[in-house]
A protein has these predicted regions:
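Compositionally biased alpha-helical segments
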Residues: 40, 49-62
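Electropositive polyanion-binding surfaces
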Residues: 2-6, 10-16, 24-27, 35-37, ...
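Post-signal-peptide, soluble extracytosolic/periplasmic N-terminal scaffold domains
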Residues: 137, 143-167, 182
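Charged low-complexity interaction tracts in eukaryotic proteins
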Residues: 112-113, 117-152, 194, 228-232
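Electropositive, intrinsically flexible nucleic-acid-contacting patches
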Residues: 21
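Low-complexity, highly charged intrinsically disordered N-terminal segments
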Residues: 167-267, 271-273
Length: 671
């Protein structure tokens, strides 16, 4: 290379034009750019020697302007068509002759720039450039089009994000939803999310940190999620929505109900007065009760259970969907149903004043509460009253002469409870609460009283479960029996030391084994029954629905739809789903409890020390009596079981699942 040679070199990846000035050592050259800046560069930094005479640094601006006149990337396509036909490569000088019919320095450098920046038509081999095949060019064009389209989509997405962050309403495109769903998965599942890299790329491109917390914050700012989004639910496999196919099947079922297999066997019980008793907010009404006066002076109790299997067949679309869900999930913000809403609250429910299909349990009791005789029937009923628990409590308190049946049913429920206690039933009376969150995210926690109406319903449902179990056991029908091993309770003298009420009940409760499901009957210790199944919530629990399928098939003399092994497999699968649903319910309730307490941090709560969790660490369980909520707390001083404390929330963060209390200490004024 000689002094005055015009060349291109690279500095930090950028193209620079300079003129060779002098050698620097054995290999390097000092070059000077148009601004007079001198740099010593090794040969490897020199990208292209333009040549064409002796140049001065001041010539560079005019040279660059001259080159720019020839920089038309579209001209390469014409050259490529010629060269691919001839199957030959070119260097920049030859390309200059082909494109511009001359090989002067500006033409040559323009050709070099076009070739070196081209990613479509040519590939470099040494100092020459070979034409790609037509197939390769077509594929690269397709890739470029895809990338251009992707960049356009990204630009549009960013624009919509900025609009939404500014408070404007936007309509998300399908491609936007893919990005948003990736953010949702990442916010909920963190590094376990398969979409995490996609989400991180989106966050980084928007100038945000690529953490799950940042994804959550962005979703809240975009109003895609609430500040109180249920991450516990989103981390599970619980399906929140029904598929289009299931909804279509549900609608067909509503419009064109299938033939009733039990039409000829349904007992007409529309003459009976039927009471359905639920919370005011309950929409899936799956049980009702009646009392019938017999000619011999005895009274017959009827427990009517909704008959959703009237609309289903084992293994059909709706049945399999219900089996997959296994249970309705009840959350403070609403429920995730087992069946589509219109079906569950419509023809499946026991709706007031409408003809309803039911599975009715008839029973005559001894004065002691023991079962004298019973029968089970598919039936048609017409619910008379849709009552709340408060309604029934008021009716019982007033002793309405117009409704003697409800008082009689309540009296029988007390006898039933006494009989179960005589059979070894274990009564645990602990405060319970209802937690509701409305559409404005206002939280209400209501203490549920252990009132006569709730006792009435509970005893009637337990009675139906006993009758269903007796029938299945007598006729060798495989159903999901529920059992509970006998607990080892603390000695009587140890229990008597504890304060009566929640403290004593808590000591008993901690000794109770979990109930178990199996296809063979076993004793249920806490209920005091030798055999028991759940049959009273077939709209909300798949185990109940399964029992209905089996019992109804036997009643009409058909083969059982499910053999023992099939029932066992289903019991195992729904058991896992129910445990997951229970965990979601518990953790979601806890979240809203902590949020409620955070919002009421100025209030003083009366608490009782229930039991020790780790006494050596002063960690125990407390009960906030006003709202019936149990929480763990590490006591800052020595306390005893049953002690009452006045507490105030010192710190609460429901998202981090943390709450700390401080005890209020009152000083007595000295006279």
């Amino acid at each position: 290379m000689e002094k005055g040679t015009l060349l291109e070199y690279r500095l930090n990846g950028d193209r620079r034009l300079a003129v060779a000035d002098r050698p620097d050592g054995k290999k390097n050259w000092v070059v000077v750019d148009e601004n007079g800046q001198a740099n010593s560069i090794p040969p490897r930094q020199i990208a292209y020697e333009i040549g064409g005479g002796s140049y001065k640094p001041s010539d560079i601006p005019n040279f660059r302007k001259e080159v720019e006149k020839y920089l038309d990337p579209d001209s390469l396509e014409v050259a490529w068509e010629i060269l691919v036909e001839e199957n030959r490569g070119v260097d920049p000088g030859e390309m200059a002759m082909l494109l511009f019919s001359e090989n002067e320095a500006p033409n040559r450098y323009a050709s070099y720039l076009l070739l070196s920046e081209d990613k479509l038509y040519f590939k470099q081999k040494g100092d020459r450039y070979e034409p790609r095949s037509a197939t390769q060019v077509a594929e690269l064009k397709h890739q470029q089009e895809v990338e251009t389209h992707r960049q356009q989509e990204w630009g549009n997405f960013v624009a919509r994000v900025q609009q939404r962050l500014a408070g404007e309403l936007v309509e998300w495109e399908n491609t936007d939803r893919i990005r948003i769903e990736a953010l949702e998965k990442y916010a909920a599942l963190a590094e376990e999310a398969r979409e995490r890299n996609h989400a991180k790329e989106t966050l980084s491109s928007l100038g945000r940190t690529d953490t799950p917390q940042a994804a959550f914050k962005l979703l809240v700012e975009l109003k895609v999620w609430s500040e109180h989004e249920n991450l516990v639910l989103r981390r599970t496999q619980i399906p929140i929505h029904f598929s289009t196919k299931v909804l279509e099947v549900s609608q067909r079922c509503l419009n064109f109900p299938p033939p009733d297999l039990d039409a000829n066997n349904r007992l007409d019980l529309t003459h009976l007065k039927v009471y359905t008793i639920d919370d005011e907010s309950t929409l899936e009404i799956d049980d009702g009760v009646s009392l019938e006066y017999l000619e011999d002076g005895r009274q017959r109790l009827w427990i009517h259970i909704a008959d959703p299997t009237r609309l289903l067949s084992p293994g059909d679309e709706l049945d399999l969907e219900a089996r997959r869900r296994s249970t309705t999930v009840y959350l403070p913000t609403g429920m995730v149903p087992m069946f589509p809403h219109d079906l569950a609250t419509g023809p499946m429910s026991l709706v007031q004043s409408q003809l309803c299909a039911a599975l009715s349990f008839s029973v005559i009791l001894e004065e002691s509460g023991a079962v004298t005789e019973y029968s089970i029937h598919v039936s048609t009923i017409k619910p008379t009253y849709r009552l709340t628990y408060d309604d029934v409590d008021e009716m019982l308190q007033l002793g309405l002469q117009a409704e003697p049946e409800i008082s009689a049913i309540a009296a029988w429920s007390k006898r039933r409870h006494a009989w179960r206690v005589s059979q070894g039933a274990i009564t645990i009376s602990m405060p319970d609460s209802s937690i509701k969150v409305d559409e404005n995210e206002e939280i209400t926690i209501r203490l549920l009283e252990d009132c006569p109406s709730r006792q009435l319903v509970a005893e009637m449902m337990i009675l139906a479960g006993e009758l269903g179990a007796r029938y299945a056991q007598t006729h060798n029908i495989p159903v999901p029996f529920r059992g509970q091993p006998q607990p080892e309770l603390p000695p009587e003298e140890e229990l008597l030391i504890l304060s009566p009420g929640p403290v004593r009940s808590s000591a008993i409760r901690r000794c109770m084994p979990k109930s178990e499901m199996a296809t063979t009957p076993s004793r249920h210790a806490s209920l005091g029954l030798d055999a028991y199944i759940q049959v009273t919530s077939p709209i909300r629990r798949y185990s109940d629905l399964l029992a209905h399928f089996q019992i109804k098939a036997h009643l009409r003399g058909d083969p059982l739809p499910l053999a023992v092994l099939e029932v066992q497999e289903i019991v195992q699968s729904i058991g896992m789903a129910v445990r997951e649903a229970s965990l979601v319910e518990r953790q979601t309730n806890r979240y809203w409890i902590l949020e409620y307490l955070r919002r009421h941090s100025g209030e003083v709560w009366q608490a009782v020390v229930l039991r020790w969790l780790r006494e050596d660490e002063n960690l125990g369980l407390i009960l906030l009596e006003d709202i019936g909520i149990e929480l763990a707390w590490r006591f800052p001083r020595a306390v005893s079981l049953g002690d009452r404390l006045d507490l105030q929330v010192a710190y609460a963060d429901p998202r981090e699942d943390q709450i700390h209390f401080q005890e209020m200490v009152y000083q007595t004024a000295q006279l």
